Every structure is written in C-alpha cells, then in structure tokens.
C-alpha cells in the first residue's frame, strides 16, 4: 500500500481529517486482526494511519552498536490504515 500525500494549491502537505484520537477505543473491521477491540496509541495524520495497541505487531532486529554488545529482537506495533477501524468509545475529557 502506497501512502499518498495530498498537496494543496500552495504546495503544502495537507493533513487528513481523522475522527479517532489517541486513547480512543476502536474495533478493527477488516484484515488479519478483524474483530479485535483495542486502544489507539498514536495517530499519524499525514499518512492516514494509526498505531493500535496489540495490532500489527512485527519483530524488528536491532544490530549491536559496539563490538561487545549483542543484537536483539524488539516487538513493535506498526501502523494500520484508518479505514480498517471503527470508533467504539471516544476518550472522555476530564
């Protein structure tokens, strides 16, 4: 999937309008993680994607920086398209 940036007449990159904010509870409606209910960790407005806790987890290999260190594996949540989710409960302002 290619992330397309929308450019307006003044040649500036526009943000997409999103109805989901970080901290909201959402439900994934399509894809590998269908019917999973989780919280939004981060919203990426320029690429129309969100990072959801426990969804789209991939393993990243980290190389050793120094000679005496060992490499490691780190599990990270990667973004999914916002069109694959539906808002269940929004975060309450306190």
From Swiss-Prot:
Source organism phylogeny: Eukaryota, Rhodophyta, Bangiophyceae, Cyanidiales, Cyanidiaceae
The gene behind this protein is rpl24
**How is this protein named in the record?**
Large ribosomal subunit protein uL24c
A cellular component annotation (GO) from this entry:
ribonucleoprotein complex
Q: Which top-level group of life is the source organism from? A: Eukaryota
Protein family (similarity comment)? Belongs to the universal ribosomal protein uL24 family.
Subunit field text: Part of the 50S ribosomal subunit.
Provide the protein's localization: Plastid, Chloroplast
* Pfam families in the cross-refs: KOW (PF00467)
Gene3D superfamilies named in the record: 2.30.30.30
